[in-house]
Amino acid sequence: MNIILFYFMPILISLPGLLASGTYPNDVYGLTYDCGKLGENEHCLKICKIHGVEYGYCYGWRCWCDKLSDKNKLFWDVYKEHC
């Protein structure tokens, strides 16, 4: 029984990272983008497209971008790639 748990433990630990892909993008000052209307809205969609992903929405009064990687999280990282 212990052997089975030993083999499945790394899989169980990595599941939350696969299920919750995305993050809050940061502006030029390193702060998250605020939003006024919860759920899907044009402001957050625009912000997420600037950061290189197709979909985002307002969650907890801040823009959340689905499938946003850490390399595109900061505005300046995205800006450097486009120059």
Swiss-Prot record:
Q: Which organism is it from?
A: Lychas mucronatus
Q: Which Gene3D superfamilies match?
A: Knottin, scorpion toxin-like
Q: What is the protein's major site of localization?
A: secreted
Taxonomy-wise, where does this protein's organism fall, top ranks first?
Eukaryota, Metazoa, Ecdysozoa, Arthropoda, Chelicerata
Q: Which family does it belong to?
A: Belongs to the long (3 C-C) scorpion toxin superfamily.
Give the quaternary structure.
Answer: Monomer (edited version) and heterodimer (non-edited version) of this alpha chain and a beta chain (AC P0CI43).
Domain comment text?
Has the structural arrangement of an alpha-helix connected to antiparallel beta-sheets by disulfide bonds (CS-alpha/beta).
Start and end of every LCN-type CS-alpha/beta domain?
22-83
Where does the UniProt annotation place the signal sequence? 1-21
Which InterPro entries does the UniProt entry name for this protein? LCN-type_CS_alpha_beta_dom, Scorpion_toxin-like_sf, Scorpion_toxinL/defensin
One GO MF annotation is: potassium channel regulator activity
Q: What does this protein do?
A: The heterodimer non-edited LVP1 induces lipolysis in rat adipocytes. Induction of lipolysis by LVP1 appears to be mediated through the beta-2 adrenergic receptor pathway (ADRB2).
Please report the name of this protein according to its UniProt entry.
Lipolysis-activating peptide 1-alpha chain
